[in-house]
Amino acid sequence: MRAIISVYRKEGIDKLAKALQELGYEIVSTGGTAKYLREKGISVKEVSEITGFPEILEGRVKTLHPVVHGGILFRDWVEKDKEEIEKHGIKPIDVVVVNLYPFEEKLKEGLTDKDLMEFIDIGGPTLIRAAAKNFFRVVILVDPEDYDWVIEKLKKGNLTLQDRAYLAWKAFSHTAYYDGVISQAFKKLYSIDTFGKEEALPLKRMQKLRYGENPHQRGFLYENPLEDIGITKAQVLQGKEMSFNNYLDADSAVRLVAEFPNQTVCAIIKHNNPCGVALGSSVKEAFLRAKEADPVSAFGGIVAFNDKVDGETAKELTSMFLEVVIAPDYDEEALRELSRKKNLRVIRFFGFQHAFDVKKVSGGYLLQDEDTVLYEKLQVVTKREPTAEEMEDLLFAWKVVKHTKSNAVVIAKNGQTLGIGSGNVSRVDSLKCAINKAKEFGFDLKGAVVASEAFFPFRDSIDIMAKEGITAVIQPGGSIRDQEVIDACNEHGIAMIFTGLRHFKH
């Protein structure tokens, strides 16, 4: 019996090689691995000894030889295969142990392109794929976590076909991930801004979550290794383990507050929707105003800031039940205060990269550019132009409605949401919902503004706004009844802006 071992990461490999040797396997290895195993007192044959051909091109070609791959791909249930390996003096290889050059790690070190290319493994993936293809006979190991249990089963002679299939699945997943990292790295390094006919998206599991969206669903967190920052890279400073829903809401929250790079803002998120968003002269004021916008929904919410949280703000945060607090930083007093709530998840967030958006549908995936453009052109389409104060509120509300589930309407005044209508199947219902929310918490709508993420198909919404004293509207435009809606605004003295850009969110 023969095993070939060629690994970059050496952890546990000496123990595995020794166990294989004790089971009667002859160990064949490549340069660095062979040297390491010999230092551990294990007898090893170099690949060049069995092929009769030396490593060439500074190690670029080591195992790409018929003696190696014939030994792996040999089918012991095919008579012609038996005749051929006997004819060519090829000995079967029964176990293949490989891990690959660390391209992913080297990518982050800022190497020159030519130096980085040296860490694209060629021989390793070829060995892995050959062994995995022939899993009926060959054992393939790519993960050190599998070494111990496989050895135990080999000792007992009860390694099943299902075990072999599992190891082959891991092997093909491993090479697919490796190639996915390389593929996406090329897009990033050479600014290849296109969606390919075929896409390989590398995903690496970070953790098993308690459950998915609901307790009966399994849930896992995977990261994209090509994105250096993002919610998966955030630092959890304290509290319970983040849940599936926490991650969804936290991601929505940080995307919203990122819309305000030059203003202090707080956003409170529930079920992937904002329930209160506000600007403030301080983080404390921003939080209090955001909470005031909907104090009922804020209970158990996710709170995000785009500025450092101080002790005074932390005291306000700990006065109510919250799931998660997210901010770019916290002062020492804030961390002391927040630590009083042992279960409260406190996260330090470093930002995110705009890449592309992926959504699962039955039988496939939808890929799209992320929605990063705020508007195409701001065009006043009514007789009256917005005042400076209205304009500030319109832009504030427009940024919020961009992150609200369709159909979405946001009512705002003085840099604070007064009412948010989200996820309704008609736009007028979203408006009514937002108005009812505002009235529920005692807000005066006179002088407030409205943002709608898509066009108003009829004038009915404008007539309702006028009755409430709302004075300005921002929307994309684009309806066949735009003129009817503009006329309604002019009748009521409402200023309206078209943005030329829609922000559906599903």
Curated annotation (Swiss-Prot):
Q: In which pathway does it act?
A: Purine metabolism; IMP biosynthesis via de novo pathway; 5-formamido-1-(5-phospho-D-ribosyl)imidazole-4-carboxamide from 5-amino-1-(5-phospho-D-ribosyl)imidazole-4-carboxamide (10-formyl THF route): step 1/1; Purine metabolism; IMP biosynthesis via de novo pathway; IMP from 5-formamido-1-(5-phospho-D-ribosyl)imidazole-4-carboxamide: step 1/1
Q: Which UniProt keywords apply?
A: Hydrolase, Multifunctional enzyme, Purine biosynthesis, Transferase
Superkingdom: Bacteria
Please name the Gene3D superfamilies in this protein's record.
3.40.140.20, Methylglyoxal synthase-like domain
Checking SMART domains in the record gives: AICARFT_IMPCHas (SM00798), MGS (SM00851)
Q: Which InterPro entries match?
A: AICAR_Tfase_dup_dom_sf, Cytidine_deaminase-like, MGS-like_dom, MGS-like_dom_sf, PurH-like
* One biological process term in Gene Ontology: 'de novo' IMP biosynthetic process
Q: What is its EC number?
A: 2.1.2.3, 3.5.4.10
Catalytic reaction(s) noted: (6R)-10-formyltetrahydrofolate + 5-amino-1-(5-phospho-beta-D-ribosyl)imidazole-4-carboxamide = 5-formamido-1-(5-phospho-D-ribosyl)imidazole-4-carboxamide + (6S)-5,6,7,8-tetrahydrofolate; IMP + H2O = 5-formamido-1-(5-phospho-D-ribosyl)imidazole-4-carboxamide
Domain named MGS-like is located at 1-142
Q: Does the keyword Transferase apply?
A: yes
Molecular function (Gene Ontology), one example: phosphoribosylaminoimidazolecarboxamide formyltransferase activity
Q: What is known of its domains?
A: The IMP cyclohydrolase activity resides in the N-terminal region.
Name of the featured protein: Bifunctional purine biosynthesis protein PurH
Q: Which organism is it from?
A: Aquifex aeolicus (strain VF5)
Q: Which gene name does the record give?
A: purH
